[in-house]
Design a protein with these regions (language model features):
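Feature captures the catalytic ectodomains and active-site-proximal regions of enzymes
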Residues: 1-253
Length: 253
């Protein structure tokens, strides 16, 4: 799904709907990029509604979001209590937070300056994380675990110039707005958002998605932002690394 960004892809997973259909079905809950407030606050509601839609609304469900280490420890302590449910959804936010931190923190940018080192940091975190502890505690139980993610990321290398109005969004791998000017070779573009299953935030809104390892910068302070974001891990655009995601099903031995 495009954009390969959490507010679109994770909401789509839990709702079972394209973003344009989420907006139609849940107009009060859906928020576009420039709207104020959290963009992923209604995932549990979306998921429960999806279960009802497919005839599974009577299942006993829990929905847990782990946004920090303390919440992770609470998950470890409570993991056995979750086994009484039919479905337990656990959203673990660390890897997405890591990709953003590697852009904003110079130390992490140095430590994760290529794909190999980025994966190494992620593996090291996982091996010492509450998530791994929780999985080990239930490894002998007769349950199915499905692990997946909502999008990947790519190390960006090539800056490209985009011109838009003040309402144009800020993400450097995709943008939507009116009167966007860009080089067609750099992006996949949709003049009609509905063609990509996306809502239309404003009249005449269009979407563009950076191809391969391109990232999009505005003319203002272009050189500064081109240097700032070069060699960082980003998501939202069109690449195999962002769009093809792992889905793993695990059972106890």
């Amino acid at each position: 799904i495009l954009p390969t960004a959490t507010q679109y892809s994770r909401n789509a997973i839990f709702s079972g709907l394209l973003p344009v259909d989420i907006e139609k079905k849940f107009p009060k809950q859906w928020k576009n990029d420039n709207d104020e407030g959290g963009k992923n606050l209604h995932e549990e509601e979306f998921f429960r509604e999806q279960l009802k839609r497919i005839g599974k609304g009577d299942l006993k469900v829990s929905f847990t979001k782990v946004l920090n280490h303390q919440a992770g420890q609470e998950l470890v302590n409570n993991i056995h209590n979750l086994l009484q449910n039919d479905i337990n959804v656990i959203v673990y936010n660390f890897v997405d937070m890591l990709s953003h931190a590697c852009t904003e923190m110079e130390v992490l940018k140095e430590l994760a300056n290529d794909e190999k080192s980025y994966r190494s940091i992620t593996v090291s975190w996982f091996e010492h994380s509450p998530l791994y502890q929780a999985l080990r505690k239930i490894a002998d139980k007769k349950i199915n675990i499905v692990m997946a993610t909502d999008h990947g990321s790519i190390r960006v290398q090539k800056s490209a110039k985009v011109i838009g109005d003040k309402e144009t969004t800020t993400n450097i791998r995709y943008k939507h707005g009116r009167n966007l000017n860009f080089e067609q070779k750099d992006v996949l573009s949709f003049r009609d958002p509905a063609d990509a299953g996306l809502p239309m935030p404003n009249v005449n809104s269009s979407y563009i998605f950076a191809r391969e390892d391109v990232y999009l910068c505005y003319p203002n302070n272009y050189n500064y932002y081109a240097n700032y974001y070069r060699n960082t891990f980003q998501h939202g655009g069109v690449s195999l690394e962002e769009m093809i995601i792992p889905v793993v099903r695990m059972t106890s031995k």
